[in-house]
């Protein structure tokens, strides 16, 4: 099974058409021009679908960068 | 009422949320040229913010960029702290920051509405409340809305609903805050070619259609929107309160 980071990278690709190789734990919004406030909710919607989890407003606030996205998703997956 | 040699000039400090890209950036630039000291808030795009800062420094424009998450109390407090630190009359809040999920009703969930309303409506409400003690006696609140507040657009249910709520909130604020010398209005741009369209399905086709339908035969520019924003926040508009000004080249008057 793909790692969480790999699946996050896949979601970045489907949302922003980014090269999956470019998404690392150190990736931040400034690295991806389309990752603005509008892009952030589109990404969140894609992550919900990919991981079959529910993300609330607090989760979106916490997901400031890829490292935090992976952390939030790991917590959600552990609780399932 | 302060006397102005030019009734369209601005003064004091103005906060522009979402003020480093697109319409917000144009407003930040125009307001600083009109005499305001601008605090241009952003959250994610450091490059765009730094680019605006560089232009401001080059042209000697009083624009401060401020990274803050408006949906959090900490981010709202950062904005308030910056206003206080400016040590000038606080004369305006322009809410350009916006987000939204563009999906049909079949794919839309309550959480999508929560995400959209958190920035588009709730953050604005919290900021107004937090900044109330700071507003100067002759100041303005301006919310940037969209046609989706009053018209049904494809995949726009969540954003349109939030903009409708935003407009209703501004009308009520206009009535409640007028006795304190604070006017509140809405500015509704029509289709404007900015990066926001990257997130909207069928953007190219919809922009082409917007051009075709526009009586002026083109899209409205960010500069035109910014000039209208300046007017609404200036002394020249001191009799305008609780209104929504549409800047769309006349598109919405067509049957």
Regions found by a protein language model. Name each.
Chain A
Residues 2-80:
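Phosphopantetheine-dependent thiolation modules in NRPS/PKS and related acyl-activating systems
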